[in-house]
Structures are given as structure tokens and as C-alpha cells.
Design a protein with these regions (language model features):
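Terminal-tail/helix-coil boundary detector
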Residues: 2-18, 243, 247-273, 277, ...
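Glycine/proline-rich, positively charged
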Residues: 59, 106-208, 212, 223
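Generic structural signal for well-ordered alpha-helices
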Residues: 20, 54, 79, 83-86, ...
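Aromatic-lined glycan-binding groove of carbohydrate-active enzymes
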Residues: 208-247, 281
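N-terminal binding-site loop/beta-alpha segment at the start of enzyme catalytic domains
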Residues: 1-97
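Conserved, mostly hydrophobic/aromatic
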Residues: 23, 35, 50, 57, ...
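N-terminal small/glycine-rich loop or linker at the start of catalytic domains
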Residues: 24-42, 100-114, 137, 142
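Short, well-ordered coil/turn segments that N-cap beta-strands
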Residues: 28-33, 61-63, 91-97, 135-139, ...
Length: 362
């Protein structure tokens, strides 16, 4: 697949099909559906396929693209490929885009690029990400996870430093517990930097944020962008008949074969039946369900083809749920024991080194 050098986005991209939601108590709106580049945009993938997906997303009103330093594979290649598309297709539209990236998981060899939240790692990683994407700044820079070996005030201090430098217009956190979210928000506020957004995992089979986190974010005025609303692809038609040979669960990766237990498959089939009665695909209903709560600013999806992207964006045509539908969904939308990120999200202040004496916001 090849494309002409010039690209003109669809002039109807802001015609109202894509709703935009205010992110917490900030001045920033995000599209109800954002596109993440965790999978399918790395150096091992077909560049022109990813380019077509990005173009189609923007044509459909998706203005927020989410990355991380180690997205690929190989690490860094998703940012590099996104930078190529930015330069070739989106350069004239940079001010229409919200670009985010993150750091916190392992990235480069040695003690300074491993899992971490140190000042050295976060600032170096942000600089590297900007270079790979060919940008002077990102709109949002995240601490991708809690680092149990680094005091929280050091991690938040690094985010505040990047914000003051103008390298990050906003800052966020991902997979933080409600307790640490409160502490992170207070530390940043003491530095004069608002915490814009939290990015937790959330789906019909992974509902941990409903217990306390959503209420905490609402109270603090922090936005929420839910990643993996399709439970790494489980909440699609792909697994209704078992595990296909080409499925992500059949390979090494984020979707483990044991997640597709008999109990989870029964839940998926039950949810699919409800989706069919609603006139939606299972994926569309799963995304719409995440967005049913106004405290969720955006659902962060992935896509491996333009057709898959279009199907997911079709969720916007059926966001309303009757009370009876929600009760029926609740019978199947139960914890599936598939939260890969709970190791970070369960950490509390007692699990971290104590802040330095005199740390602000403590």
C-alpha cells in the first residue's frame, strides 16, 4: 500500500461524529476515543499499515495519540514511526493534536534505563522521545508506573521539571493506586503543576477503578483515560470460538493463554449476546460501556487495521444504555483476573522509600 506525498485530512472530521470531553478540571478536551500505539506500530510492523490507521483516525476526529518510550517492538520504534507520520502527514496539523508519551518500564540497558521513576530516567527518556518523534514538546508526559525503589516526590519532581521546561504541557500518571494518586496530585500542586490525567486499565473484565479510583479522580479534578477497554482483544468476536492460530493469546505477549479460561469465555459469549441485541459488535459495546461513566474522559483503543479502527469508532453511534441493559451486563462483567498492571496499582506509600525531609506536598 502506498500513499501520495501530500495528505489533506477530511474537512468533515469535526462534524460532530466524535464527541470531545473535558479532561478533569483542566481546559483540555480529549476525543471520547483516543488511539494508542502500544501494538502494531513498531519496527516489526508494516509502516504503511500504521500510517493508514493514523490517517483514518484523524479523518474520523481522533485527535489524541498515545505512545510510550518502549512501544514497538523494538523499543522506541513506535515513537520513531509516529514521528515519520507527523513529519509527512500531520506537520501542518500539530496544533490539532494531543500527543502523549510515557516512561517507567524498562527501556535501555544498565541501571538507569530499567523499570524506574528516577529523575535521571524520566528526564532522559522524555528527551529521547522528543528526538524520536521530532517534537519540541509533548502535550502529556506520564509516569508510566509506580517505581517502588524511588521516592514519590522525586518522580513527581521530575514531571514538574519537564513541565516547567516546556517539554510537557501537561503531566499524568498511569497505574497508580488511589492513595498514591492523592499524594502525587498534592506533590505536583505544591510545585504549581496540576495533575491532568490518570491512565488506568479498565474494561468489562477488569473493573478495579470503580472501587475507589474514579471517585478519587473526580474529587481531585483529574481526568481519566481508560486503556485496554477491549481487555487486550478478548472483548472482540475473535475468541468466541476459542483461540485462533494467529491470535495474540497464542503467542508470547500481553494476552496470556490462561486469561481465556472457561469462565472468561462464558462471560465474553454472554456479553456478545447482549451486544448483538443492541445492534453492536462486542468491541463496540465494550468501548461504549467504558464511556458510560462521565468520569471517564476517553477510551484508549488500539487497532491493527483501518477496518478494525472503523469498527471500534462505531461505538460512538450507540453510547446510551438502558438501566436494564446495564443490569444484564453486570451479570457477565465480572473480574477476569487479567490485570497485568496490578503490581503497580496495588503499591501504597508504605511500599515506597519515604520522601526526603522537607519535600513539598508531603
Amino acid at each position: 500500500m502506498s500513499f501520495p506525498d501530500s495528505y489533506s485530512p477530511d474537512p468533515a472530521r469535526y462534524d460532530g461524529r466524535m464527541p470531545y470531553r473535558r479532561c478533569g478540571r483542566s481546559g483540555l478536551d480529549l476525543p471520547a476515543i483516543s488511539l494508542g500505539l502500544w501494538q502494531n506500530f513498531g519496527g516489526a510492523d508494516v509502516f504503511e499499515t500504521g500510517r493508514a490507521i493514523l490517517r483514518r483516525a484523524f479523518d474520523r476526529g481522533v485527535t489524541h495519540f498515545d505512545l510510550a518510550n518502549n512501544y514497538g517492538p523494538p523499543y522506541g520504534s513506535a515513537e520513531a514511526n509516529f514521528g515519520r507520520v507527523l513529519a509527512a502527514d500531520f506537520k501542518a496539523h500539530r496544533d490539532e493534536l494531543v500527543v502523549s508519551t510515557k516512561a517507567g518500564w524498562d527501556m535501555w540497558p544498565g541501571p538507569y534505563g530499567d523499570v524506574g521513576g528516577s529523575r535521571k530516567y524520566l528526564i532522559a527518556s522524555c528527551d529521547q522521545s522528543l528526538q524520536r518523534m521530532g517534537l519540541d514538546y509533548v502535550d502529556i508526559f506520564y509516569s508510566h508506573r509506580v517505581d517502588p525503589r524511588t521516592p514519590l516526590d522525586e518522580t513527581m519532581g521530575a514531571l514538574a521539571h519537564l513541565h516547567r521546561q516546556g517539554k510537557a504541557l501537561y503531566v499524568g500518571i498511569s497505574s497508580y493506586s488511589p492513595e498514591l494518586t492523592r499524594q502525587a496530585e498534592a506533590m505536583l500542586r505544591a510545585e504549581g503543576v496540576p495533575l491532568l490525567i490518570h491512565q488506568p486499565s479498565y474494561s468489562l473484565l477488569n473493573r478495579w477503578i470503580e472501587r475507589e479510583l474514579l471517585g478519587t479522580l473526580d474529587e481531585l479534578g483529574v481526568g481519566c483515560i481508560a486503556f485496554s477497554p477491549l481487555a487486550q482483544g478478548m472483548l472482540t468476536a475473535k475468541y468466541l470460538g476459542g483461540i485462533p492460530a494467529d491470535a495474540r493469546a497464542g503467542k508470547e505477549g500481553s494476552l496470556r493463554r490462561e486469561f481465556l479460561s472457561d469462565a472468561n469465555l462464558a462471560r465474553i459469549r454472554g456479553l456478545d449476546a447482549i451486544a448483538r441485541r443492541r445492534g453492536q459488535s462486542l468491541a463496540q459495546m465494550a468501548i461504549a460501556w467504558v464511556l458510560r461513566d462521565p468520569r471517564v474522559t476517553s477510551a484508549l483503543i488500539g487497532a491493527r487495521s483501518v477496518a478494525q479502527l472503523d469498527d471500534s469508532l462505531g461505538a460512538l453511534e450507540g453510547l446510551a444504555f438502558a438501566d436494564e441493559e446495564l443490569r444484564e451486563i453486570d451479570a457477565f462483567a465480572q473480574e477476569g483476573d487479567l490485570d497485568l498492571w496490578e503490581g503497580s496499582a496495588k503499591l501504597g506509600s508504605a511500599d515506597l522509600p519515604q520522601p526526603r525531609l522537607g519535600a513539598r506536598g508531603v
